[in-house]
């Protein structure tokens, strides 16, 4: 193990070394340009990995499901909430579940008519993986949105939509978030088009409910 307690420690050290080398050899690119370049690269890398057939199948699974739950923890949990809100605006009532214990409880009550969408950039988030196994045991369908299709979560899912971030340490970065949100937008707009949803009318209803909450 060369002085490391496990493979995870080795991966982290390699990532840190790569990160340190970039800091020791700065380029002439200004930091705001570098951030923009990183976000653009994350987006286009995800586009290059896109499998249109799998995307259409995922949209079909969403359409046919009775109940939809979205699992994620940490930064992926925040993306789960984003997708819940995006779905609501096209009339899909999905529920984001961020707490690992509650994920397990929800998973234990799922059936073959239900769908779980899982966010995990690493594909190795233990709590989420444990809940996935419970959901699978009960016959629920699983869509995984992850950076690694051969990860435990990726291999256990019925369908994988792949994101792309360059560095191991970027898991909680905006790069990863952009990749995930791009996939979210594809799912929502695809559902909207395939089901002839009048999104203007729905968004008007949502907007009116928000305006009614405002104090004059």
Model-derived features: where do they sit?
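Short acidic/histidine-centered micro-motifs embedded in hydrophobic/aromatic stretches
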Residues: 13, 17, 61, 205-209
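Glycine-rich phosphate/diphosphate-binding loops that line cofactor/substrate pockets in enzymes
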Residues: 53-65
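HTH-adjacent hinge/linker in prokaryotic transcriptional regulators
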Residues: 1-54
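Surface-exposed charged/polar residues within alpha-helices that form helix-capping/stabilizing sites
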Residues: 45-48, 60, 108
